[in-house]
């Protein structure tokens, strides 16, 4: 113990207190155990409450000790001793009577407050809080109101990081809340996940506090948050208390929290318990105070409508009213129509009274589906072919369209994920949709019989028979199963046309080798009853190549070209983990992708390159999103590509972009069984385990979205790859454009007559070949035209000397800037590099960075024009 502390504690020499604060912190904390022992002796003395000198000594020593501990960062070493002193102090009264017989803070209360303040200063330090919280909770039972208030604030702060430590004292905290310490209500949601049983037992008393006028709005919101957590874990405990919540649905401050409770109950299949609150939900839907919650209210009403036919009619009435009142808001209108379609697939009779309203809406896919529910005998309208209105393309021609989007480059073929942030998914195939609608209306007929290939061909060409004579008798369907790896089905409808209709027959290669029984699910989807699938002999010319490449050489496998129109409707299973993840985060994904696209675009495709003995790397590809220029640099046939160090982030973004496009265009989610999802998953599986860390693809994409720090890594990678030298963001349409589309005035030199003349000329320094770093720069005079890049050894060539073509623009594979990116390229700020088809490269350096950028842009536009002329 320092001698000044000894004089102060043992001899009560208050005159050394000023010198004590000038002593080094490390000298003060020496022999701390003896110091605390002396403090406890003084605090426990019977004369302490009345001895002013002892009180001053203790206050000075405690202040000096806590300051030394704080400044030296040794709280973990001395927390136990500080807590021990606090425990000794709390054994004494916290209030005392003054001369006016009023309750005031006792001397012990002042020391307790100082110790609590010092300990809870480290509320994020779990070892310290583990020791402090059990003793601090004793303060809640004190008769000193100010001490209880301060302790409550400390515990509320500590609960953010120490919910598990507090959870063992859940019953004590709940008891304090019920007795009137309402500020502790904010703590309850933090400790519930680690100790649920006390909350379930005391839930009735906690919910009663919602009606207490002394509980403020923020505390009531915490109670509703707690109720939502209970609804997610043990909904049956909460359901009896739901009538107490109904009044708060019309409160602007509390409606959002209550709607979250309802959504939690719906996710737990307790929708039926919400039917009694439909009148209040309708009032909320019609009020302008809840305009931000209309989408959520719409979904809740629709889920209630699926419970029974009477509720369906009532729900549809309200949803139609919402559609009328929100016709100008396309997002809400799309959500309402999707929910009406979902109700109509289960209770089609609920839609009949609103048929005139649906017919007044603009024609779209969702309106067609709703109108299809309205006609109980719609088989003829849906299944027959109208030559004037419907396409007469055969199944083979539709399949061939799919492969028009395949990109072939060298020895590999890659498949596009999406084209741009606003790319649309293909519409549902009419035949498949018609078949689903027919079997929805006839789902009571049970299992469907099988039909031979001959009968299929006969029914497809049955133009002279009465409409659906075969279907009305046997209600048969043929189903061709894809190979098991694709997990998709192709449904063949049976159109019966009039005498003027064109007869279509299936090629022999499309003969199904095994038929599969199907059934209609509650959501209106046609699915197999069960059993395995057998492979089918597909046409020899139909191929599909998925990216990335398989381990080893890149190969192309034979498979049926599945029409993307069918993909939306096939096996969209509600038990799909990915489906559920996206379904509950639609708006969040749309907002997130919108923010990301403002910083950088999402790749349109990816490949994995590497052989058996080489390192596998993922290559990502970008294209111009506008393509407004006739010389667009980066089109479907020529993409900007580079190898990435962060495949997980890029695949995550590609997945979110895929879902965002589907949600925006159709209001639906792309599930795990879709071809787009499986393509991305296959790319992930082909990466080595050193990159994937053996994490499943669905686990990776359902994790937290990449944060701003992760996005900054990708922006830096794009910068190093020269992306921002080739693309710019167009703020007017929120798209990333190539140089040609951003600067259309530069394109006219290439596309107008006389474009073969000089476009750009000047002196550049050049290096080429191997070991370039050992060579000197050679100054040459370059001339760029729409056909070639020419150069001469003359500094200023005369008109009589023609420049010989040096590099044909059609032979240039790529050109990139060396002025951005890695620090090692600081000396090449004014340079750019050209790669040719014969695997040679040339580095050219301009007089300044602006001139180098001009050469780079003109070269890119000239290359695009040359490729276009060659095509």
From Swiss-Prot:
Superkingdom of this protein's organism: Eukaryota
Domain PH: 757-864
Keyword Oxidoreductase in annotation: no
Subcellular location as annotated: Cell membrane
Keyword set, alphabetical order: Cell membrane, Membrane
Entries under InterPro entries matching the protein: ARM-type_fold (IPR016024), Melted-like (IPR039888), PH-like_dom_sf (IPR011993), PH_domain (IPR001849)
A single BP term in Gene Ontology: regulation of signal transduction
Family: Belongs to the MELT/VEPH family.
Annotated protein name in UniProt: Protein melted homolog
Organism: Caenorhabditis elegans
Lineage summary: Eukaryota, Metazoa, Ecdysozoa, Nematoda, Chromadorea
């Amino acid at each position: 113990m320092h001698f000044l502390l000894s004089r102060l504690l043992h001899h009560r020499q208050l005159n050394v207190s000023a010198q004590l604060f000038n002593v080094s912190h490390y000298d003060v904390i020496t022999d701390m155990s003896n110091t605390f022992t002396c403090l406890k002796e003084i605090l426990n003395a019977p004369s302490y409450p009345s001895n002013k000198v002892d009180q001053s000594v203790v206050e000075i020593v405690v202040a000096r000790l806590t300051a030394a501990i704080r400044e030296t960062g040794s709280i973990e070493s001395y927390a136990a001793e500080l807590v021990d002193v606090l425990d000794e102090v709390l054994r004494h009264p916290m209030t005392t009577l003054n001369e006016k017989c009023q309750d005031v803070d006792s001397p012990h209360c002042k020391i307790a407050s100082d110790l609590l303040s010092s300990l809870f200063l480290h509320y994020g330090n779990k070892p310290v809080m583990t020791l402090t919280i059990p003793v601090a909770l004793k303060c809640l039972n004190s008769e000193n109101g100010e001490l209880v208030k301060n302790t409550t604030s400390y515990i509320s702060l500590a609960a953010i990081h120490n919910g598990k430590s507090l959870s063992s004292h859940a019953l004590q905290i709940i008891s304090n809340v019920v007795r009137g310490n309402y500020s502790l209500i904010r703590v309850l949601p933090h400790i519930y996940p680690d100790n649920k049983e006390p909350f379930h037992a005391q839930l009735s008393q906690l919910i009663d506090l919602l009606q207490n006028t002394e509980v403020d709005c923020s505390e009531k919101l915490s109670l509703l948050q707690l109720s939502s957590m209970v609804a997610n874990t043990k909904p049956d405990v909460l359901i009896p208390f739901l009538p107490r919540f109904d009044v708060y649905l019309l409160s602007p401050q509390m409606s959002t929290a209550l709607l979250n409770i309802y959504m939690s109950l719906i996710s737990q299949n307790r929708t039926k318990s919400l039917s009694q609150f439909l009148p209040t939900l309708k009032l909320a839907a019609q009020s302008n105070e809840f305009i931000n919650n209309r989408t959520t209210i719409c979904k809740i009403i629709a889920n209630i409508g699926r419970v029974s036919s009477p509720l369906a009619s009532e729900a549809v009435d309200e949803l139609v009213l919402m559609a009328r009142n929100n016709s100008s808001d396309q997002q809400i209108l799309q959500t309402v129509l999707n929910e009406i379609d979902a109700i109509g697939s289960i209770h089609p009779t609920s839609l009949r009274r609103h048929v005139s309203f649906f017919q007044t809406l603009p024609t779209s896919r969702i309106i067609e589906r709703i109108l299809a529910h309205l006609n109980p005998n719609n088989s003829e309208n849906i299944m027959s072919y109208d030559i004037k209105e419907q396409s007469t393309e055969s199944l083979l021609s539709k399949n061939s369209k799919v492969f028009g989007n395949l990109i072939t480059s060298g020895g590999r073929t890659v498949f596009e994920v999406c084209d741009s942030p606003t790319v649309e998914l293909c519409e549902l195939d009419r035949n498949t949709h018609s078949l689903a609608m027919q079997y929805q209306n006839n789902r009571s007929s049970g299992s469907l019989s099988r039909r031979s290939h001959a009968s299929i061909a006969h029914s497809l060409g049955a133009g002279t028979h009465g409409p659906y004579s075969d279907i009305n008798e046997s209600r048969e369907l043929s189903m061709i199963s894809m190979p098991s790896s694709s997990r998709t089905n192709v449904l063949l409808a049976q159109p019966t046309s009039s005498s003027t209709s064109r007869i279509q027959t299936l090629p022999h290669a499309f003969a199904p080798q095994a038929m599969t029984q199907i059934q209609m699910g509650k959501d209106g989807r046609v699915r197999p009853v069960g059993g395995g699938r057998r492979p089918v002999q597909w046409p020899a010319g139909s191929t599909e190549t998925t990216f990335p490449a398989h381990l080893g050489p890149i190969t192309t496998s034979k498979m049926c070209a599945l029409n993307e129109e069918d993909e939306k409707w096939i096996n969209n299973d509600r038990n799909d983990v990915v489906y559920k993840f996206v379904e509950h985060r639609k708006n969040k994904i749309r907002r997130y992708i919108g923010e990301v696209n403002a910083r950088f675009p999402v790749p349109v495709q990816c490949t994995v390159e590497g052989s058996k003995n080489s390192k596998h790397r993922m290559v990502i590809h970008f294209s111009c999103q506008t393509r407004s220029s006739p010389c667009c640099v980066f089109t479907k046939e020529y993409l900007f590509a580079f190898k990435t160090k962060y495949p997980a982030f890029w695949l995550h973004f590609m997945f979110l972009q895929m879902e965002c496009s589907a949600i925006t265009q159709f209001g639906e989610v792309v599930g795990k069984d879709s071809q787009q999802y499986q393509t991305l998953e296959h790319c992930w599986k082909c990466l080595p385990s050193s990159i994937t860390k053996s994490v499943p693809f669905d686990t990776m994409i359902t994790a937290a979205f990449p944060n701003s720090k992760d996005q900054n890594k990708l922006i830096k990678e794009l910068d190093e790859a020269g992306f921002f030298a080739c693309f710019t963001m167009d703020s007017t349409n929120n798209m990333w454009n190539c140089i040609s589309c951003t600067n259309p005035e530069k394109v006219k030199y290439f596309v107008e007559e006389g474009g073969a003349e000089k476009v750009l000329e000047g002196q550049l320094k050049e290096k080429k070949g191997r070991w370039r770093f050992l060579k000197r720069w050679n100054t040459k005079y370059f001339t760029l035209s729409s056909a070639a890049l020419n150069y001469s050894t003359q500094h200023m060539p005369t008109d009589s000397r023609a420049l010989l073509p040096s590099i044909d623009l059609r032979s240039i594979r790529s050109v990139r800037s060396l002025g951005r990116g890695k620090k090692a390229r600081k000396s090449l700020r004014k340079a750019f590099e050209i790669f040719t088809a014969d695997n040679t490269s040339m580095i050219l350096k301009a007089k300044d960075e602006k001139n180098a950028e001009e050469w780079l842009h003109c070269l890119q536009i000239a290359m695009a024009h040359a490729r276009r002329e060659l095509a």
